[in-house]
UniProtKB/Swiss-Prot annotation:
Entry keyword Signal: yes
Span of the signal peptide: 1-24
Binding site for heme 2: C187, C190, H191, H335
Residues at which Ca(2+) 1 binds: G78, E117, A118
InterPro entries, sorted: Cyt_c552, Multihaem_cyt_sf
Functional note: Catalytic subunit of the cytochrome c nitrite reductase holocomplex NrfHA. Has both nitrite and sulfite reductase activities. Catalyzes the reduction of nitrite to ammonia, consuming six electrons acquired by the electron donor subunit NrfH from the menaquinone pool, in an anaerobic respiratory process of nitrite. The other biological function of the NrfHA holocomplex is to detoxify nitrite. This function is essential for the survival of this organism as it enables it to overcome inhibition by nitrite, which is produced by other organisms living in the same environment.
Protein name: Cytochrome c nitrite reductase subunit NrfA
GO molecular function: heme binding; metal ion binding; nitrite reductase (cytochrome, ammonia-forming) activity
Length: 524
């Protein structure tokens, strides 16, 4: 009898341990042992048209078409294409959570002309061809064909045809050689058309993976569920003519994914000849402070990878392509690439956080985003003040410190670093949520670097510029609300802000391009 009880007790204990283990496994890191679905489509290996995938996968395609939505905002983000520097006007022109100093900080760089909240991926080519960053007032756009890299799977054809010579071609050369809807970011960007296996089509990502000893065709599926997004949602730069293939895109990840890692990388991978910045990389020189600058691009992948979710194996697809049920109750991955915050039930989050209510989960996201956004505004103001301090010090006519030139080099270095650290978070599209600790730490460092620039400029002028930096920065350097290529052709407009004196007045010109339509002939 006692033996039977003992055996029964041991059996119950064993079952209990199994249950606990199963429960724990359900709450632990996401398994990377995902079974890969196997398909055999009727498509060719070269198929890139989005419409060709619709008959094969109508349910997924229907969800993909939801990327056409352009009216819904979350608290800080959304798909309404407002001007991201305009916190004065209401939607759709501006928005209360805009950053007013963007045009100041990007003065002299095409981003100063237009920078809007992105619409869905289905509009990638349409919005690209209408944006003012590309010169539409001349036959040539003034930017390399590299800019097409993350807009279309047609890149594969173009690179195959032209090889590495493709990258340095003018962006407008391909303006009318593409279907804005059928060739936009879509199925072929991430899937093999014949098997639907996830694949890497990005040249710079392939180059990086190979440099790390990885075969892009033999990666675990869970890793691929993030990397297909990491083809484009990343920081990148274009090679200079002396640094390899001219204008070829490169991911600056050789030293790591954090802003400090990238900043070290950029210090060694450029061809600048400016005193104090020799051999460093710069996207442009800010005309007000004369500082060689780096423009950060949307580093979502780098932000996510060592955050809470990235470290746990939770991928982009888990949150932004969560499972849904079609009308016939079939379970599919949604191809509406959007914020989980647009779902009142927060179902993407509750796949793991099933013990939390939707309201609680939203409140936690907003808690992080508010703290991040408040620091973004603070960091950009200190960055603007740093540019102004260096500008004033450049032109200071009073008695200067003995080490003036060296102090000014150091000041510009801190301007450059402070703005890059701010931009790393500003350009990243989660308002801090992909990695709250990294976002807040990066913005704190940004303010420290920018303040150091101010201190160095003050020291260089023996504090002679102090009186001109005293007071509210919005009064000292007003935010630039409007600036575009047409306005830069107007001499009177160019007198409306003191920083505009460092920009040339553009010659009068008619608009040549409206999307893919040529309006007038242009002389080169």
């Amino acid at each position: 009898m006692n033996n039977q009880k003992t055996f029964k007790g041991l059996r119950l204990a064993a079952l209990g341990l199994v249950a606990v283990a199963a429960f724990t496994a359900g709450c632990s890191d996401v398994s990377t042992e995902l079974k890969t679905p196997v398909y055999k489509t009727k498509l060719t290996a070269e198929e890139i048209r989005n419409s060709a995938f619709k008959p094969e996968f109508p349910k997924q395609y229907a969800s993909y078409e939801r990327n056409d939505e352009t009216t819904v905002m979350t608290e800080y983000k959304g798909s309404v294409p407002f001007n991201k520097n305009d916190n004065v006007n209401p939607l759709p022109e501006g928005y209360r959570h805009a950053q007013p100093y963007l045009k100041n900080l990007w003065l002299g760089y095409p981003f100063m002309y237009e920078y809007r909240e992105a619409r869905g991926h289905t509009y990638a080519i349409q919005d690209f061809l209408h944006i003012d960053r590309i010169n539409r007032y001349a036959e040539k756009g003034g930017l390399p064909a590299t800019c097409w890299n993350c807009k279309t799977p047609k890149m594969m054809e173009w690179v195959k045809e032209s090889g590495d010579g493709f990258w340095a071609k003018d962006v407008n050369e391909f303006r009318d050689k593409i279907d804005m809807k059928d060739h936009t970011i879509g199925c072929a960007t991430c899937h093999d058309p014949q098997t639907m296996e996830l694949r890497i089509t990005s040249v710079p990502l392939t180059d990086y993976l190979v440099s790390q000893g990885k075969d892009p065709k033999k990666l675990p599926r869970n890793e691929m569920r993030a990397l297909v997004c990491g083809q484009c949602h990343v920081e990148y730069y274009f090679n200079g003519p002396t640094m390899g293939v001219n204008k070829k895109p490169v991911f600056p990840w050789a030293e790591g994914f954090d802003p400090a890692d990238m900043y070290r990388y950029y210090d060694k991978h450029g061809d600048l000849q400016v005193k104090g910045f020799e051999g460093k990389f710069a996207d442009w020189t800010h005309p007000a402070s004369k500082t060689p600058m780096i423009k950060a691009q949307h580093p979502e992948y780098e932000t996510w990878i060592n955050g809470t979710h990235g470290a746990a194996g939770v991928t982009c697809a888990d949150c932004h392509m969560s499972y849904t049920r079609s009308d016939d109750k079939k379970k599919i991955s949604s191809h509406w690439w959007t914020s989980p915050m647009k779902d009142p039930e927060m179902r993407a989050c509750r796949q793991c956080h099933s013990d939390k209510t939707p309201d609680y989960l939203k409140s936690r996201v907003l808690f992080t985003q508010k703290r991040t956004f408040d620091l973004l505004l603070a960091a950009q103001e200190v960055s603007v003040k740093a540019h102004e301090a260096v500008r004033l010090a450049n032109e200071y006519q009073g008695a200067k410190a003995a080490g003036y030139d060296d102090l000014m080099i150091q000041a510009r270095e801190m301007v450059r670093k402070g703005q890059f650290f701010w931009d790393y978070v500003s350009a990243e599209n989660s308002v801090g949520f992909h990695n709250p600790a990294k976002a807040l730490d990066t913005l704190a460092q940004s303010q420290q670097f920018s303040q150091k620039a101010i201190d160095l400029a003050m020291e260089a002028t023996q504090y002679g510029i102090g009186k001109d930096l005293s007071g509210d920065i919005k009064t000292i350097v007003p935010p630039i609300l409007k600036m575009n290529r047409k306005l830069q052709q107007d001499p009177e407009f160019m007198k409306t802000h003191k920083w505009f004196q460092y920009l040339p007045v553009l010659p009068k010109a008619d608009q040549v391009w409206d999307g893919q339509k040529r309006l007038v002939s242009a002389k080169q």
